Amino acid sequence: MVISSNAFIVGRVGELDLITAGWHFLQRTMNNEDRRGFEKMISMPGFCVKKFEETYLLKRVNPFAQTEEGRIIKFNSSDCPCGKSQDVHNISAMKDQLSNFLDKWENVHEKFSLPTGSSELTTSKTPIDVDTKEQENRLKQKAEAAPKSTPIENHKKNIQALCKQNAVAEQCLWNVYHVSGKPAEKKEQRNDMDRNISGVSVKDYETLKNFEDKSPPQAENASSSKKDEPISVECTDETSSRLSPATDISHEMAEHGTPDSGMISDVSEIKVLPAGKIEKKLIKELNPEMMVGRDGRRYRQKLREAEKQATVEFKLENFEQTNGEAQSVENDILTGKEKRRLKDKLRKEKKEQSKLFVEKDLEKNKESSSASLSTNKLAESPTEADKNSNVIHTNIKPKDICIETEYPANNDNKKKSEVMFSSTVTNVFGRNENQTSFDVKEHTVDSFELLPGEYRISNFGQQMADTTSAEMTALGKMPQEAGEVKPTVREHSGANFLQRERNFPLSLKTTVIANSPEGDIEGKRLSKGQKRRARNKANKGVYVVNENGSHSIELLPGEYKLLELDENKKIQEFPIDTRHYMRDDQTGGGSKIVEQGQRTKKKKNFYVAGNLSKNILDNGKWLAYVIDDKNSDGVPRVGEVSTEEVQETIKLLDSKISHNAIQDNSCSEDFEFGSSSSTNFVTGSSRSLLPELDADFVRKTLADYEENATEDAAENNNEVFESASEELEMFMNSEGIAPNFHSEFAKKTSPLLVGNAEFKDFCSKYSNSKYDNKTISKLVKKYIDTRIVHHYERFKKLADRESHRIAKSWTKIYETSSYSLMVMLYTNSPSSSVGFSDLEEILFNDR
């Protein structure tokens, strides 16, 4: 909002007038008890004049009133920035010094003023008198030589010297001094007092006292007989008149104040804090939960980080207790990416350990097929493998796992190396050498890539690769033993890497989902890029919610992303890739891609837009991603939600998907007849909102509805239906002459419409539509109902008797002819030259 300079200045002047009038009113209405309370209030260290004026004077509230409003509104000095200052004690000390200074000055003025005439004084000059006169002359010479300064200037210098380092205290003291401490005497009288008192020195108290006691009686003539009064600190009435344009002051300015609230000065703008020690002291004194601004946000962020770190350390301690061989994790503060990596690492280790302890009972029925596969591979002769240019021998044992590589014969430096992993594999996964070992014949794993000269094992977990890298040693070629597998090797054209197929235990396979009792849950292979894209979508709040992936829903923080929970309590996310992979033991060979349409069992509980059936809600359980906006990492957590929560979430998603919002149709002709958006919306919705908007309700409330309207309808029904199809033809065939209409409505409207070329063109354009009499009567009734409701509401709000008469007259009209429908459509069109008021003037002109 932009405020002009004129309005701003006028508002400020008016605000100052309100404050001035408020102070005068407060001074006139205070009694003795109120004065004592007010004196205590202004003596408080944290008292601020600006805050007091904003709270009471601008709002015209008497702080000493005994009404309910006065008792509710109390002045709180803690809200003022002055009360939060660390130097409130200095402020009170300076106020005490000011009061002591004024009291002392008054006492000195009264006691040590120049002596008046006295008859008891002698005129004899003694040596003591000479000495006192000399001392008096010296004092006068010193006072005249020194620069004259008023008490107010000395007081200002004293204040500046005391509170030079504290701007807030200086400002508060300045406010108190200028509001309540300004002298009330006239300028001439104050100058005389300053001139008379300037020569008095407080240090020579005894000398002046002796001089007063022993002064000669002739001093009466030389001394001034005028006795000055003490300085008064009472506020004087303001004599200057100001404009008070109360009508030009906006409500916002008068109620809440302008930017600096019309005070003497803005204390809040002065923020001069000395060192960092004061800030630490303030933080200790203030309540951390009540802190606002940047400091409060930073403090609460540190609290949240400390709580997160405590939970991470607690989980790590529990994990170390249950798994003794897990790696030790440093207790330093981990932030962001390091925490996520640590969580992923721990999750992978736990998953690998749980897979190693899977019982072999579920695999007994598959031993025959996997054993036949392994024997077929062992039947290959070593001579055929040596004919290839590149050969990789892989030996897997229960205790030792070896990798042997042989390079081409034309290579001068033939390198034969093996990598041996002894008991490290079992130690990593929580197994000892004496425990049950792997059975190589039972399972198969995915193929992976191996670069020349590099040896790496995939799908063993991150910790296995780290712990075994230090123990890799080069060994000679070892003979093959029973149970060893020699994989086939093939070279890709135009590439310098080898791809091979190896047989590893199925428990080490990370991308295969655990078996269900029926064996129909299929595994998915997702590349790193696909996983990264899915994770980014989840973090951003965008997720695919239906099976076919035809649309996506954007969710705000705190809402839910629906996922499926299968029979084994495992989360089934919606697939990014439409292809699915079957396991090797099901296909009898390598992994085979199966299209989505060939799957035997359809997944349940997939969200479909608009589907809120009981089967969807009650079939199984639902999980949801809950996005927590307070989580700094932005990683969604997974938790189970109730059916009611799922139902509300689906409603929310449906509202985001649906684009068929109900439009507010101003014209009745825009409604599609027979559709839910026309009949139900006009009749049903209007009845539920306001019964007066229902034309049938208005008809029943009118007086002569049952007597006249129903009888007329019964008499004229047959006539109208017979002549319904004839009136429009009669009008189209007429050439400027009014035809002999049968219905009363057509007869009365013929002078207005017959001869109107625009209406005739309108009828020729839209008269081709064929409606039955029932449809026409319903369409015409909509227009009549609109006019009834319009005039009845006008009668209710404006007490217009003419509108009541017209509404009652519309209830007597029952038209089913196509001519009356054309009249209504033409009158309702925006470009028509005839309105409903013209029709009503002709139809109901019975006065």
Swiss-Prot record:
<dbReference type="GO" id="GO:0015749">
    <property type="term" value="P:monosaccharide transmembrane transport"/>
</dbReference>
<protein>
    <recommendedName>
        <fullName>Uncharacterized protein C03B1.7</fullName>
    </recommendedName>
</protein>
<feature type="region of interest" description="Disordered">
    <location>
        <begin position="208"/>
        <end position="245"/>
    </location>
</feature>
<feature type="compositionally biased region" description="Basic and acidic residues">
    <location>
        <begin position="128"/>
        <end position="145"/>
    </location>
</feature>
<dbReference type="GO" id="GO:0015149">
    <property type="term" value="F:hexose transmembrane transporter activity"/>
</dbReference>
<feature type="region of interest" description="Disordered">
    <location>
        <begin position="361"/>
        <end position="392"/>
    </location>
</feature>
<feature type="compositionally biased region" description="Polar residues">
    <location>
        <begin position="116"/>
        <end position="126"/>
    </location>
</feature>
<feature type="compositionally biased region" description="Polar residues">
    <location>
        <begin position="368"/>
        <end position="378"/>
    </location>
</feature>
<feature type="region of interest" description="Disordered">
    <location>
        <begin position="116"/>
        <end position="153"/>
    </location>
</feature>
<dbReference type="GO" id="GO:0016020">
    <property type="term" value="C:membrane"/>
</dbReference>
